[in-house]
């Protein structure tokens, strides 16, 4: 099974939203692929679940989150060898954190441009995030099976 890891700073907003959208869309088309998510600087967010505005948008999309009650996870707590693709949500924000984490130096990380609140409103970032995830799933469908 193909596995994707979405990464943001705190693992409560963009990466969690992307994980839930990806898994919903992949299940819908019977794609043998699943996503998970983690944060680069989880810190005190380890006691937080998915951000309420992300939950609200998922509800509007009729997506029932599978991990809505689970707490944030730091990227260092995962076996990164399990993932075929690692995507950081915002290059400008996340690349310095990736560079500071020696565990991540040898990984091939894809960077998106989904900017966090308050820099960009959720009315812009969440639809953009959905579109990027949907495009990723559609690309996976078209990719030849190995």
Sequence positions of predicted segments:
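Conserved active-site segments centered on acidic
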Residues: 1-77, 145-146
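Short glycine-rich anion-binding loops that position phosphate/pyrophosphate groups of nucleotides
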Residues: 10-12, 91-94
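Hydrophobic alpha-helical segments
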Residues: 22-25, 53, 90, 98, ...
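Active-site loop/turn elements of alpha/beta-hydrolase fold enzymes
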Residues: 40, 91, 114
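A short, aliphatic-rich alpha-helical micro-motif
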Residues: 80-81
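Receiver (REC) domain switch/active-site residues of two-component response regulators
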Residues: 84
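Phosphate-binding/catalytic loops
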Residues: 94-146
């Amino acid at each position: 099974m193909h596995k994707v890891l979405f990464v943001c700073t705190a693992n409560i907003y963009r990466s969690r939203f992307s994980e839930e959208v990806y898994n919903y869309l992949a299940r819908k088309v019977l794609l043998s692929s699943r996503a998970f998510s983690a944060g680069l600087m989880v810190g005190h967010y380890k006691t937080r679940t998915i951000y309420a505005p992300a939950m609200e948008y998922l509800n509007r999309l009729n997506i029932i989150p599978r991990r809505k009650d689970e707490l944030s996870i730091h990227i260092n707590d995962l076996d990164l060898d399990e993932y075929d693709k690692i995507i950081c949500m915002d290059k400008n924000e996340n690349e310095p954190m990736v560079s500071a984490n020696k565990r991540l130096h040898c990984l091939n990380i894809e960077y998106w441009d989904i900017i966090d609140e308050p820099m960009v409103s959720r009315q812009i970032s969440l639809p953009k995030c959905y579109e990027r995830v949907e495009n990723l799933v559609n690309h996976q469908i078209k990719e030849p099976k190995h």
